[in-house]
């Protein structure tokens, strides 16, 4: 029998989160399109299944990082318009009807020539730099967009930017100010593409909503009150060992039993996205109770202290991420223990875990 490591994705929770964002936009009295971000395999949740759900819910666009991600969706039958955020690859753009994001003039010229050669009009979005310091047109963005608009066979459907610290009101307002000036300039020229800058945290600012929003983490249950995490990661106890006081556990003996102890072994390690930095810090749930991770997390195995759990047995379920009864371990908890962010936690679990999709109401 193969080892059990399962990422359970609750599509009911996904639907709840998407609907909550739509309700927020409606209550804010803003008519906004939604660009659902499904890059990195939908943050580890499985892009194809997640995109299908969003398509049924009437999402306006999907957003991916690279063309290869979009091609997987197209070949799975996803028809929703797909924006490719960070790529210069062109073959997939034309073959699979994708919308590339342009982040410099040279890229725009190249796409224009290719579109002209193929005899098609290519819809594009343009990224402008407002404070992220990563990708985007940063020198004379207004004039550069004006020049791009004059290129053959390109249709500017959108202009975007990205918040670098949406939790910082002053900095975010400065970014919005720069973005608004570009929007005003283009409107004065009679150009009215779709403007979008708001990520999940940006939804908190009404003035950031513009013409579209790009929720990511929030869709998967994190970032604000009332959103429900969609992913549960579980495994089963591989072994249970009775060890005397003073026994060192795992590599380096970083944990030594302080009393006679019951130590469980689970078939999960850092190769599965369960970070080594969780050693002696994290907790998991066994039989409805939290128990600590002890010793160094190994490549394929992790040890947990079961001393206080009654009648525990081999093959008992172990919750690494998720809720059971009154106990819950979230990606935010794991991120805090590991010294990282929830995004990294969710995207790291997808590698060797088998996914199972369910439709269940949250208890």
Swiss-Prot record:
It comes from the Bacteria. GO terms for cellular component: cytosol. Keywords: Isomerase, Pyridoxal phosphate. Its cofactor is pyridoxal 5'-phosphate. InterPro entries: Ala_racemase, Ala_racemase/Decarboxylase_C, Ala_racemase_C, Ala_racemase_N, Ala_racemase_pyridoxalP-BS, PLP-binding_barrel. One of its GO terms (biological process) is D-alanine biosynthetic process. Coiled coil: none annotated. One of its GO terms (molecular function) is alanine racemase activity. Its EC number is 5.1.1.1. Catalyzes the interconversion of L-alanine and D-alanine. May also act on other amino acids. This is Alanine racemase. The gene is alr.
